[in-house]
């Protein structure tokens, strides 16, 4: 699930006393989160905290296993599309059940897709279903939701028809296409997925003792899950911990079994907990969105000035200190390779470089174009240590450009930040974006008209034309597709529709008492695959 993420140290980790007993069968796994879970409604969630929870409690047709391979879930097998790659027909398991014991049906998927796309839902995730036939007409209200290219052929047979072939669609199926419990939705209405009393689950766990304002919640094994006998961790307790120092202290005291840390703590943690420190590259981009509705931040030369002022290597090495790496483009390293086997970014031009001379040159141009000597920009961030550190670094770099570049920082809770971004109540900000399928288009869409989270509302005809060419897969080889994507990324580096900052690394502290808990490049760790060591 492509999602908004925290910068630097991300979402995962917990709290409570570790057992010294070797019998861990009833032991609660304790971890932490940096933010609250906002919703477990798969049609509405946009943030990493919510989608980490959803990935544990809701399963779709396919899923990714612990090695990142696509495997069947509610569908009985991985199907081959027909109709020139546009039609997928799935038979569903008869033993897939919701946590109330009722069966998951094809109608639950149809209801979910229609609800996510229809305009009255106002889902920021609607665009993830944009490949389905008649999406545009339904999403704009020109056609009824019943016209969307999805049908329940029978109680346990589902058909999805796309408007065009999509080469990575198995990943979309595994990470974006989730059912909703139709009966629960009819009963609960707008309360669906907003607290644990109104949360439907067909996955390995169900969420308990939770609402969007609570700092603690628990995942409890779902006894109706079709694979429940393979789920070893029976209970997972989460506690919101916003500072890495507190997370480290809790792990040192054995009050938690897993947490995520960042910054200067990483080096010491590696020494103290060598066998329990897990460093993983993560397919997640940190970037600056610019509000294109505002004259100041719409100015290309101002955006270029700040981009050139940011020393991404120094930011990663001296501020984050957690293995994060400088962004080369809007697409993270490792997402995809070109025909020669080289990383995608090897073919991207207009490199993101640090050059104060150029930064000052473009700032002067911005002053002239805006008719202002002093330029004020407020940078919106979430209120965590990692966010604040990155924002303060950017603020200091702006001052190096000119005393007249007045960049101020406003730190607020992530939920409010997302709300302000959605309402365009910002100048610029800091955000993270992750995807769940190995194709650059989801990152390139951060600056396209169809972008799910294009808060900037930035558009450019030349850029959009390339995006449209990328999306026209009918007469396109994989090599041609990658070249078009590299062309788009190169243009975006030049035009700064968004300003890439760095690629996340995740550093987790994980108890030696557990095995099978992995941190993938794409997607989220899955607790159903973890187990206590005997």
Could you tell me what each predicted segment is?
Residues 224-269:
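Ligand-site clamp/hinge motif
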Residues 326-365, 386-388:
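Structural transition elements
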Residues 309-339, 385-395, 422-534:
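Detector for C-terminal structural segments
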Residues 76-128, 296:
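Aromatic- and charge-enriched surface segment that lines or borders ligand/interaction sites
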Residues 33-81, 200:
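N-terminal lobe/hinge region of extracytoplasmic solute-binding protein
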Residues 162-231, 235:
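Gly/Pro-rich hinge or "lid" segments in bacterial periplasmic/extracellular proteins
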Residues 125-183:
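Surface-exposed binding/hinge segments that line
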Residues 212, 356, 361-435, 450, ...:
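Ligand/substrate-recognition segments at binding pockets and active sites
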